[in-house]
Amino acid sequence: MANKKSPAPGWPIVSGEYVVGNPESCVGVVTLGSHGLEQACIDAGAAIVGPCHTENLGIEKIIANYISNPNIRFMVLCGSEVQGHLTGQCLKALWENGIGDDGGIIGAKGAIPFLENVNKEAVERFRRQIVEVVDLIDCEDVNKITQAIKECISKDPGAIDEEPIVLELESGGEGTEEEGATVKPTSPEIALLEARMRILSEKINSSALLAKYNSGYYNGKIQGIAIGLFVSILLFSLLGI
């Protein structure tokens, strides 16, 4: 039987939209932008299951809850990718590459993939602890997800030979995901709507510029004809034609 350790007291140490199962399980599941998969994952044996809507504070909360439980050695990424934030891709990049000196996740493609409340040591502990990331991004097939969880459990290497690390995440300011111990996730539908509104705004601006150009062109053309006609009449008058 794999060796197990006690997680930090009060685990999970950061509250959120999580469903908690067996704290001795080796599997954590991130459902990204999807909901409704949690109970099936818990029934399959996961330790903790929940979404991740943002590529900064959301990921910080995952790191904090994972490294405070040495038993979690696998991370399953599933559910629909969060448009704009790309939290699944950012989590993979974090595990593969870590963070730079500025806190930016190396290779991440999300909008703002910067970790302000988690240092390199915590990130490196997370990377050491998680031995495998199972990529089921954009998969909501319960059978595939639960099968992946069971396969991870069958390969359980036991708890990492390090003590739990407790991170104290600072409360975010206005408009951030965290405010105290509560979570205010960014809806993926809103993120998609904002992206479409930006595209529409750009198209409107382009159309306005084109209309302005056309208006100036036609006005100039009319003025040119009028001036040409006036000059012609003047010349005819001078020549006595």
From Swiss-Prot:
One of its GO terms (cellular component) is plasma membrane. Binds 1 5-hydroxybenzimidazolylcobamide group. InterPro entries: MeTrfase_MtrA/MtxA (IPR030688), MtrA (IPR005778). It is a single-pass membrane protein. The chain crosses the membrane at residues 221-241. It comes from the Archaea. 5-hydroxybenzimidazolylcob(I)amide binds at residue 85. Its EC number is 7.2.1.4. Its main location: membrane. Keywords: Cell membrane, Cobalt, Membrane, Methanogenesis, Methyltransferase, One-carbon metabolism, Transferase, Translocase, Transmembrane, Transmembrane helix. Pathway: One-carbon metabolism; methanogenesis from CO(2); methyl-coenzyme M from 5,10-methylene-5,6,7,8-tetrahydromethanopterin: step 2/2. Residues 1-220 are cytoplasmic. This is Tetrahydromethanopterin S-methyltransferase subunit A.
